[in-house]
Amino acid sequence: MPSYKLIYFNMRGRAEIIRYIFAYLDIKYEDHRIEQADWPEIKPTLPFGKIPILEVDGLNLHQSLAIARYLAKNTDLAGKTELEQCQVDAIVDTLDDFMSRFPWAEKKQDIKEQMFNELLIYDAPHLLQDLDTYLGEKEWFIGNSRFDRGIVIRKIYSHIQWKSLICGKYISRSMVDA
């Protein structure tokens, strides 16, 4: 078993999907958290100056979704066929497109809150309805893959602080808690 060290800020953010995968697969890893005050000194030492970084036996991997795909590739999380893998990638990329629209770096709290609220009120319900429609009556999003609604939906909900605005009205609570 390789040795894993995940390097990210002391927050959920882009490393959270990696942590979910480690937890789901019961893989032990070092969760190295960087404080914001230390970032200016650390940034120039990293590939492309970005995190998260996953060290695998000393080799640095970067880009959160590439890392997630690497970890999921040899499990049932990534899909069993190339077609299923493409479907998994499409769902993950759809969620990433949505999450990338949030103003995470906005410094002005009132503007940040307004932008968050607009995305949650106007856009999140459509995304969640699309995911609900895509899932339909199936148990899984993709084939019989364990890449299930829990991992997908929790990825979004872990970032949405105001989930009560949409939970229950646009997607059933049981799907979130599954």
PLM regions: where:
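GST-like domain detector, emphasizing the conserved glutathione-binding G-site
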Residues: 1-128, 132, 137-141, 165
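GST superfamily/GST-like fold recognition
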Residues: 88, 141-178
